[in-house]
Every structure is written in structure tokens, then in C-alpha cells.
Amino acid sequence: MQAEGAGTMHELSITQSILEISLKAAAEQHATRIRAIRLKLGAFSGVVPECVQMYLDVLAKGTIAEGAKIEAVTVPLRVECRACGTVSEIDRRHIACPACGSVDLHRLSGREFLVDSLEVDV
């Protein structure tokens, strides 16, 4: 059962992975503290940055990532129309080619989810 306003188990497991990746990368650079974790999230990734931050605040306690902030950049949904070849950015409200109206689209970006960079103390 999920409390109102709480994150989902989806974000919990994602946050665990983010923390593991970040701690490993920071250790390789001999970092003493992680100040920020920068993410690239596709508009259709399904990841809610506020939920990731909430879980990170709990999971990172006692690690060099304690107090780290999540900074997320959203990658727009880019598609190529199979009917006319137009490449464009679309959103959830208008899932059709803006040039010809076709819904036969090939996704080029928009589901990304990656740790892009860290801000650390060394």
C-alpha cells in the first residue's frame, strides 16, 4: 500500500541503483562527498525526480552521498514519422506527426534514464 504523496517501489529500486552507481563512480575518483547527482530523464521515462530525492535522503544516510541533491534534466520525446520522415519533438497531448498527422512514429529519444554526472568533493 502506498501512502498519499509517497513515491513508488519503482523509484525505490531506481534510487538504489542510482546510489550504487554514484558511490562506485565517486570511489573511483577518491571523492570524500557527493554533493549532487545529475540525471538525464526522458519525458516518458516514468521517473519522478522528487520521489528519487525522497528515497535518496533515506538510502544515503551514513554514506558519502548523505545530503546529496538530485538534479534532473528532462530529455524531450523525439520521434521520426514513418509516413513522411519528419523528425520532431512531441508531448503526451499530441502524439501525432506535426507535419502529416500520422501516428506511425518511431521513438528516437524520450525514455532515457541515466546518471549523467556527479558533483563531488575530493
Task: Name every feature range the model reports, one short phrase each.
Residues 81-84, 97-100:
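Short cysteine-rich clusters marking metal-coordination/redox-active sites
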Residues 89, 105-106:
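Short functional micro-motifs and their immediate structural scaffolds
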Residues 61, 94-97:
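Short, solvent-exposed secondary-structure boundary motifs
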Residues 18-21, 25-77, 83-86:
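A broadly conserved sequence feature marking short terminus-proximal activation segments
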Residues 79, 95, 113:
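Cys/His-enriched microdomains
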Residues 75-76, 91-92, 110:
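Flanking scaffold residues of small Cys/His-coordinated metal-binding clusters
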Residues 2-4, 8-23, 46-49, 65-71, ...:
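Extended interfacial segments that mediate partner engagement and assembly in macromolecular machines
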